[in-house]
Amino acid sequence: KARHMLARTTAAMAGGGMYDQLGGGFARYSVDRGWVVPHFEKMLYDNAQLLGLYARLGTAQGDRVAGETADFLLRELRTPEGGFASALDADSVGEPGGHAEEGLFYVWTPTQLVAELGPDDGAWAAETFGVTAEGTFEHGTSTLQLRHFPTDPDDQARLADVRRRLLAAREQRPRPARDDKVVAAWNGLAI
């Protein structure tokens, strides 16, 4: 029973909005019971411990999520000195002189998906990631969720291509601030 609960919980976390479906890594916590909307802050200590958990699951999903989380840590939190920064903020500023908005870097609308991917891949991505016109977050935006990882090799290749293209598009958005404080204990969890 405990293994079933672990498998179900880790699958729900990895498929929900708490997990960054494009860039890897986990948000600090979810603000709803369905794990759709995260508090978008990404902490080193959470990701270090979750990386270890997913790596020990011994499943294809665990291996994928552990690898993507490790990539996130190395790409987003590694400092020039070789340690890891403490966190990425939940907020980023959209317009010059504007105010910080939670989740702005991470959320999408169907229109944005079509603009980045074209009509076919945009519609496919909206369906695959649960992005709706009503939105799952604020102002008609949605967090990306991947409740069912494709099993068909063609769909897996399409998903990889869509994720790569959306990640590249997201990199053009205003980024959340990074807390460059290097905490030895948190770094110890990550290495």
Which residues fall in each region the model found?
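Glycan-recognition and catalytic cores of secretory/periplasmic carbohydrate-active enzymes
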Residues: 1-191
